[in-house]
């Protein structure tokens, strides 16, 4: 195997590994991906789904961005200061064809996998070797509070 091919395989296997770990850690999210949302506080889930939907509508040009009077009418609010935020709205875009629950769960799963991968990248940047860096990312992904 050439050096470039091995390097490309290493770069692909790490995020795939974190994605598989995120699926295992969040089970049964993958099984119920388009039908149920994860979490215990249902009003938070509904609010988050609304922000994801509003971001998709803004990207499509159907609503104004970033201010809306749909919340806190008549004064409105900027969705940029919301905890869900526009980045999650962008990450949800590929999952919308499967419905609102899939968009919410897709963002949750993507965020979980990316948290491990980003800590891996940070550890590699500061000189930690691949194995311990992967373990550090896995521990961060599995940690209950981020």
Task: Annotate each predicted stretch with a short phrase.
Residues 1-29:
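Start-transfer (signal-anchor) and selected internal transmembrane alpha helices
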Residues 4-10, 37-41, 124-131:
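Membrane-interfacial loop-to-helix junctions in multi-pass inner-membrane proteins
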Residues 9-13, 95-107, 128-136:
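Membrane-interface starts of transmembrane alpha-helices
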Residues 18, 24, 107-126, 130-146:
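Membrane-embedded helix bundles of polyisoprenyl
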Residues 21-115, 143-144:
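Membrane-interface coil-to-helix junctions
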């Amino acid at each position: 195997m050439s050096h470039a091919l091995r390097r490309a395989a290493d770069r692909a296997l790490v995020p795939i590994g974190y994605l598989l770990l995120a699926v295992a850690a969040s089970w049964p999210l993958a099984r119920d991906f388009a039908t149920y949302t994860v979490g215990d506080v249902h009003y938070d889930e509904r609010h988050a789904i609304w922000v994801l939907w509003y971001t998709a509508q803004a990207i499509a040009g159907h609503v104004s961005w970033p201010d809306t009077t749909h919340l806190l009418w008549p004064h409105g609010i900027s969705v940029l200061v919301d905890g869900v935020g526009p980045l999650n709205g962008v990450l949800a875009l590929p999952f919308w064809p499967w419905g609102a629950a899939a968009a919410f769960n897709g963002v949750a799963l993507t965020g979980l996998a990316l948290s491990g991968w980003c800590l891996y990248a940070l550890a590699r940047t500061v000189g930690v070797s691949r194995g311990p860096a992967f373990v550090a990312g896995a521990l961060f992904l599995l940690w209950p509070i981020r």
